[in-house]
Amino acid sequence: MQIKPLGRSRFKPVTLLVPKWRELVAYTPSGIKKAKGAGACYDLLKSLEMHNLYVSHTLKDLLNTTGSHMWQAEMWKGHVTTMSLDGTKVKVHSLRRILDDFDGDEQKYLAFLELAEWLHDWGVAPGSISAMAWNLWRSTLDQEFSLSFNSQIGRQSFYGGRQEATPGQTYSDFIAVDISSAYPYEMARRPYAGTLREVSPRTPLEPEIAGIAQARVFVPNDLPHSPLPTRSGNESLAWSKGWIEGSWTWSELSAAKSLGCKVEVSRCWAPLTEVQPFEKWWEVVREGRATLSPAAAKLVKSLSNSLWGMFGMTGDDRGVVRWTDQLGNSPEMVQKRSKSLPQSNTAHIAAETTSRVRVRMLLEGLYSPSDLSPNNPVHVDTDGVIIPREALKSFNEMMIGNKSGQWRIKTVMKVIEVRAPQLYRYKTETTTTWQYVASGMTGKQAEELFKRNPQGFGVSLLPNVSQTL
């Protein structure tokens, strides 16, 4: 894939829609506009068809404005990406609930307007979160270059973040820590392979080089945390013991060796060309996160965290949804044929990025960074762990802080009870009531989910910490 610097963009006004039952409020650059009744909602939407339109929450709420039979939803991997209105050029994107922590629709609109103005300075037009993330990166490039490697091999070594938990247990004196700006920091830290070439299986697996290898690995059964992911089904990851086979990055296989695993490489690929295309981008992102308002800065953070996944996108599992009723209760999906995306041969970039974060989680979060003894985590989630407070002593002073790439202390927990990855509750030294945490939910929603699942669910089990402490 040839990556080119961003060219000229077409700019349109941005508008935030707040849909209700047969009502619509639109926050526009020229003021707030309102409509009541299905016909009036349609007319208002049509008048805004030359705007970039967004909702803060779910796109499906738009069905309530005019009736669902007038809308069409674009789907990708089971998620609605955009919705369009019949007889108009209206196309609506979602802000993916990024601003849910901020009160008031007007405040959310002003935050997005601030983001749009900041992007304008870089020549980036508003669009979907993914499109803005991609074009912001391209705006920081000063020359064209190539990213291209065998898509099958790249995808075989592409795994997601590590998520594990010990459900149904209560622990005392624990601490939640995470790596600040883990993904963008690792993207900018060292070079990637522009493309790779096959080399001898006996080639040393240098952890700082962005290589890939197919290997057979023996993970000792007494190792507390398996270092390498394998696939269980299409989406789930497993952390298995004994003999496993697969493709991983050099960095991840080197980490496995350091923990005592036996690695037998059958095929190996090393960088033929190297590129470091994210340094300027990371400078721009950090500037935006530091200078914009908290709400707008959170949107910039979302853009920066979305970029790496673009390199692993595929054009399969696509479709459109129509509704045959006015209430949105009778959806019909039409599957669309798979198409080849330009990013289909850049999966090695996504694979290397996620691997870098997993290796740090493994060698610093799950195991002690000083001597590789177990840190005994009870909760692992992508770029953060919850570990005994005592384990923090193995981190040196330079590793802990609020700078990008450092381990940040989020919460000191007097008591914690875990149900699943991204689902737990805790008390601090200064609180007497439980604080509930669940990904993408309010505290009240998290509490309800927590109480509905007393034994936990769908988890990858960690060793029982009460038996290892």
Question: What are these model-derived regions, one by one?
Answer:
Residues 1-12, 18-469:
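Conserved acidic
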